[in-house]
Amino acid sequence: MTLQQEIIQALGAKPHINPEEEIRRSVDFLKAYLETYPFLKSLVLGISGGQDSTLAGKLSQMAIAELREETGDNALQFIAVRLPYGVQADEQDCQDAIAFIQPDRVLTVNIKGAVLASEQALREAGIELSDFVRGNEKARERMKAQYSIAGMTHGVVVGTDHAAEAITGFFTKYGDGGTDINPLHRLNKRQGKQLLAALGCPEHLYKKVPTADLEDDRPSLPDEAALGVTYDNIDDYLEGKTLDPAIAKTIEGWYVKTEHKRRLPITVFDDFWKR
């Protein structure tokens, strides 16, 4: 088995999908999890206005609405959380995503004060954060807020990770990567677009340039610029296509280097890090 085949298998990626079937699969997956643990009453997700959170949010709301109708349990709810750092540049996209998702409840938690307080506490301890590390601080603060909300609403935190993101480890460890349940796992980026199109999502929400937008010094830095490869490259790789060797090497380099992000804390029984 080649490394490409190993990666495709590990991430559950497929070269072709039926969007309607994958929508149903994700919704049923979320419903089944909640039914297994009836003490859970909410799905919680941060909405950024980008493709991934818009899709995960819509699927979550669909799952909650169906389960509420089927069980008569009106305590079930989907909570969409806006988590700006100060004022978000693409706030209108966030509002458009909320309008498309139609969540049961919307909360807004501005994380700027918490991030600055944490940064100041570290500064007083003699640690000055770099812009990159401050970006990770933002991602972790967002996740902390979501878990606090989930804790107070008997909920679970929904993640937006998918195969095209997982392969490169393009997420913050214990930040946006630290979630309870990931309904998009297995899909690549273009397949996520197919699901949103099938759901009737406004095109600008899934055709916009993907960006984590975590760094102050490089605002709205495109994911593809940070990675050195395009999502089309990554999707082609995950679909089993043959790529330029240099591009394939870059993708595989990211996969190997970020394996620790896809694992629980390393123990003496792990050896993946030795390769």
Curated annotation (Swiss-Prot):
Residue numbers binding ATP: 46-53, 160, 189, 211
Top-rank taxon: Bacteria
One of the GO BP terms on file: NAD biosynthetic process
Top enzyme class: ligase
InterPro entries, sorted: NAD/GMP_synthase, NAD_synthase, NH(3)-dep_NAD(+)_synth, Rossmann-like_a/b/a_fold
A Pfam family: NAD_synthase
Binding site for deamido-NAD(+): 140, 173, 180, 260-261
Gene Ontology CC annotations of this record: cytoplasm
Binding positions for Mg(2+) per the UniProt entry: 52, 165
EC number assigned by the record: 6.3.1.5
Reaction catalyzed: deamido-NAD(+) + NH4(+) + ATP = AMP + diphosphate + NAD(+) + H(+)
Subunit structure: Homodimer.
NCBIfam families per UniProt: nadE, PRK00768.1
Family affiliation: Belongs to the NAD synthetase family.
Record's function text: Catalyzes the ATP-dependent amidation of deamido-NAD to form NAD. Uses ammonia as a nitrogen source.
Record-given protein name: NH(3)-dependent NAD(+) synthetase
Gene: nadE
